[in-house]
Amino acid sequence: MNKGWLELESDPGLFTLLVEDFGVKGVQVEEIYDLQSKCPGPVYGFIFLFKWIEERRSRRKVSTLLDDTSVMEDEVVNNMFFAHQLIPNSCATHALLSVLLNCGGVHLGPTLSRIKEFTKGFSPESKGYAIGNAPELAKAHNSHARPEPRHLPEKQNGISAVRTMEAFHFVSYVPIKGRLFELDGLKVYPIDHGPWAEDEEWTDKARRVIMERIGLATAGEPYHDIRFNLMAVVPDRRLKYEGKLNILKMNRQTVLEALQQLIRVTQPELIQAQKSTDGQSTEETKSPAIKAPVSQESHRAHHGSHRSTTDLGAEPAGSLLRGPVLSAHNKSKPLPQNGGIVPAPASRLPAFLDNHNYAKSPMQEEEDLAAGVGRSRGVPPPAPDTDEEEEEETENVRRPLTPPGFKRRSSESLPPPPGPEPGVLAEKLKETQRDLCSPLSIKTGAPTAPHSQPSPTPSNESTDTASEIGSAFNSPLRSPLRSANPTRPSSPVTSHLSKVLFGEEEPLSRLDCVRYNRAVRELGPHISTGILHLSKDGYLSPLSRLDTGKVSPKSHKAEEPRESPEPDSERNRVTEAPQGEKFSPKELLALLKCVEAEISASEACLREELEKRKKFKIDDQRRTHNYDEFICAFISMLAQEGMLASLVEQNISVRRRQGVSIGRLHKQRKPDRRKRSRPYKAKRQ
């Protein structure tokens, strides 16, 4: 029982893989580098490594030293999972079990659930024997340890093997029933550090206790000693980012539906035009003379969809009219009622939505492009009614080479611009629904999208290890309200839309757009934590859960375009808007940009977590691999080539020149610095 347990290193990747081998799901281990910074997010417990003062850490005898903070009540001690360490080198597993088996809401798996149920009410000594009699724990423990040497070196005279080895020990800090406990398997009783204040978290008190302990051990110099290490047991961040991505994608679909509904409300005359063009498309597609130009134009549009938005904007308007004329048969049809997908060989989108994909992430767009899914382009029929914004849109489309600073704002005599149609976002919504139904997949080997945020830590995939990546506690995510920062690359979809609709890209990319944009200010904090709801009347509202479990929406309505109200400098927190408040298209586009920025940031964080798991496994394989066979084969090859003897002789001669004795270590004789009595001189000259 007490033989065969190996020492484990203090590495967060090792402990994360050990937790998975125990059968626990949804838990990982992170390393803490700064004790003065607050730990974001929930923390199940801390694992603290320090240098053990006694001669042997893995001794059978448990320390009997007691102090005022020791909890000696059997009822309290037996109701928590506190086990004596009766097995050498098992302190890492003891510390990890002390955290996992004392916190609720964790999927322990069959092995730990059976141990927790079996040892309920046992004494600490009995729980220690239960850990030693669990072969699953011993197997998982030793699978992540370095292999021990087969032949131990001979004991050298005059040197104590115990005193020369530095022993380290793991302990746990866990919150139990409102009090902070320190669980040390080499002590008889757990240590109670008391409750924490009402205005702080338990992690704040634990950090203070650990800092005081480090300060006492290092004579007041806590940051000049590397004999300590602190790790935190936290929820799995992969599950966190996956859930956040699902919520963001559903909210993106809701915003797109709000835009589509806004088009139907503001321009109802286009509904009849859409129906008439749909009827013409069914008749024209029957003739084979029209099918060939349509297929050629679709093929040409598919190859042209790979170009950037700058190239599309710089293309003259006359070039769009070359080739076969596509009148009305290549318009996108509205979304069918049964949820099916209507095949559109040459889908038509308006100018401000052309060649963009709302419903897919950058990595999924690459997959679609590789599969041959393309977008066709064409010129829509002009709408009879125009306003100032539509004239700006027409000017941007027909004069793409004009610099943004010299664009005309006044209304001029221009041809009627193409107006948005009711089926503008139908195809985008269908693709969004397919995206929501498909399982979430992140390609870790794919190149990073231009508008996705890279990892702040530079890394080389071939050489960096997981321990060099850093901790997630030191790199907090941006809040939704900060996603409009110009340092973050904007989405090509919303930037092109804002450039076409409003004449310039700057308003939606400036930092102060958060002040005057009501949609981002009021719905921005909810896009990654809650689901947005769109009613039939056009009210866009976040769903807030009440104590009864019901969901109540806070209504904000998307209505016809109008200027946003003046910013309120004193309004720093999200408040409930009055009933019937309306959002303009500019505000909805800004909200859409905020959602897309959060999706890009979450995908980058999820990709980074997956890369960390890969490097954890690489480090573990390097650590546990047995290199003895390779070394023996290499030495035998040197002996066969006749090079071994010369190398050994050369190495010995180098050591002799450096003054290092080859044989038995001799105790160096120190010079005698004692004061010697001088002979008394009787006579003085």
Swiss-Prot record:
- Give the PROSITE patterns listed for this entry: UCH_DOMAIN, ULD
The EC number(s) given in the record are 3.4.19.12
According to its UniProt entry, the function of this protein is described as:
Deubiquitinating enzyme that plays a key role in chromatin by mediating deubiquitination of histone H2A. Catalytic component of the PR-DUB complex, a complex that specifically mediates deubiquitination of histone H2A monoubiquitinated at 'Lys-119' (H2AK119ub1).
Family of the protein in this entry: Belongs to the peptidase C12 family. BAP1 subfamily.
From which source organism is this entry? Xenopus laevis
Supply the name of the protein.
Answer: Ubiquitin carboxyl-terminal hydrolase BAP1
Site features described as Important for enzyme activity, chain residue numbers: D184
Per the record, the domain of life is Eukaryota
Quaternary assembly? Component of the PR-DUB complex.
Q: What GO terms describe the biological role, i.e. biological process, of this protein?
A: heterochromatin formation; negative regulation of DNA-templated transcription; protein deubiquitination; protein K48-linked deubiquitination; regulation of cell cycle; regulation of cell growth; ubiquitin-dependent protein catabolic process
PANTHER family of this UniProt entry? UBIQUITIN CARBOXYL-TERMINAL HYDROLASE (PTHR10589), UBIQUITIN CARBOXYL-TERMINAL HYDROLASE BAP1 (PTHR10589:SF28)
Locate the ULD domain: which residues? 626-654
**One GO CC annotation:** cytoplasm
Q: Which reaction does it catalyse?
A: Thiol-dependent hydrolysis of ester, thioester, amide, peptide and isopeptide bonds formed by the C-terminal Gly of ubiquitin (a 76-residue protein attached to proteins as an intracellular targeting signal)
**Chain positions of site Transition state stabilizer:** Q85
Classification via CDD domains: Peptidase_C12_UCH37_BAP1
What sections of the sequence does the record tag as coiled-coil?
none
Q: Where in the cell is it found?
A: Cytoplasm; Nucleus
Q: Where is this region: Disordered?
A: 272-347, 363-425, 440-496, 543-580, 659-685
Q: Membrane-spanning regions, if any?
A: none
Family annotation (Gene3D superfamilies): 1.20.58.860, Peptidase C12, ubiquitin carboxyl-terminal hydrolase (3.40.532.10)
Compositionally biased region (Polar residues): 273-282, 450-496
List the biased-composition ranges (Basic and acidic residues). 556-574
Report biased composition (Acidic residues) as residue ranges: 385-394
This protein's UniProt keywords: Chromatin regulator, Cytoplasm, Hydrolase, Nucleus, Protease, Thiol protease, Ubl conjugation pathway
Give one Pfam hit by family name. UCH_C
